[in-house]
Amino acid sequence: MSSHADSKPWTVPALAQAKRDGRKLVMLTAYDAGFARTFDANGVDLILVGDSLGMVVQGHESTLPVTTADMVYHTAAVARVLERALLVADLSFQADATPERALDAATQLLQAGAEMVKIEGAGHKLDVIRYLVEREIPVCSHLGLTPQSVLRFGGYKVQGRGEAGEQLRRDAQAAVDAGVSLIVLECVPTPIAAQISAELRVPTIGIGAGPGCDGQVLVMHDMLGLDSGHRRPKFVKDFLAEGGSVAGAVQAYAQAVRDGSFPDAEHAYAA
């Protein structure tokens, strides 16, 4: 467990300080009080109530059917039991279609206990980000493979190869300029993710983006080796197999992120 775990709850400013200190951030998804309590007590710094719940909890084929009401329900359940982890919640599909809609959804999530909201994509979403930040709502930007864009991408594929890598760098910097406090990079080649992480003043959290990010996140079902009904991505590792219990798996995952042993080349994408 990190030294921060023994001191005080995580805050948004503490995330930036962790990056300056070179301390890796450990993030996991959670959707209910039971798992959230266990994760919080065993070294997880940030908990994400992700719209991934559409697939791993509700049994859908994608995140698209998830509603703001779904997100609020699960966010509130998780928030009730957290003592130290910072709680991030996703804006669901099209909840961020306009700044006004995003503000309404984000307000509901913060009232339910979230401390930051996550928005997928850049481009026109930058106006949404600025609108929320100007109204004192912390924002995390999700770049690379954005699951809400699965139809446009034609499936779950690595993003940021070749010239697309330069656009990803520009998008990340634009998101920081718009005021985000955190960036998630998903399914991005290791060199590009490392370069982006080195260039930005805010922390990056990788998922299939290599060890050069400032932290890592996994969907809890993947970290525990549970069958989600979908193909296992390359970046997934079953920590329950070596941890022996849920708490042990979380501790093993947290330690591997902090000491840099996860992700290794086997669980990342080359350029």
Curated annotation (Swiss-Prot):
Transmembrane annotation, as ranges: none
Enzyme Commission numbers on file: 2.1.2.11
Enzyme class: transferase
Annotated residues for binding of 3-methyl-2-oxobutanoate: D51, S52, D90, K118
GO MF term (any one): 3-methyl-2-oxobutanoate hydroxymethyltransferase activity
Superkingdom per UniProt: Bacteria
A GO cellular-component term linked to this record: cytoplasm
InterPro entries: Pantoate_hydroxy_MeTrfase, Pyrv/PenolPyrv_kinase-like_dom, Pyrv_kinase-like_dom_sf
Binding residues for Mg(2+): D51, D90, E120
Cofactor info, note text: Binds 1 Mg(2+) ion per subunit.
Signal peptide: none
UniProtKB keywords: Cytoplasm, Magnesium, Metal-binding, Pantothenate biosynthesis, Transferase
Recorded catalytic activity of this chain's protein: 3-methyl-2-oxobutanoate + (6R)-5,10-methylene-5,6,7,8-tetrahydrofolate + H2O = 2-dehydropantoate + (6S)-5,6,7,8-tetrahydrofolate
Gene Ontology biological-process entries: pantothenate biosynthetic process
Quaternary data: Homodecamer; pentamer of dimers.
Function: Catalyzes the reversible reaction in which hydroxymethyl group from 5,10-methylenetetrahydrofolate is transferred onto alpha-ketoisovalerate to form ketopantoate.
NCBIfam families: panB (TIGR00222), PRK00311.1 (NF001452)
Name assigned to this protein: 3-methyl-2-oxobutanoate hydroxymethyltransferase
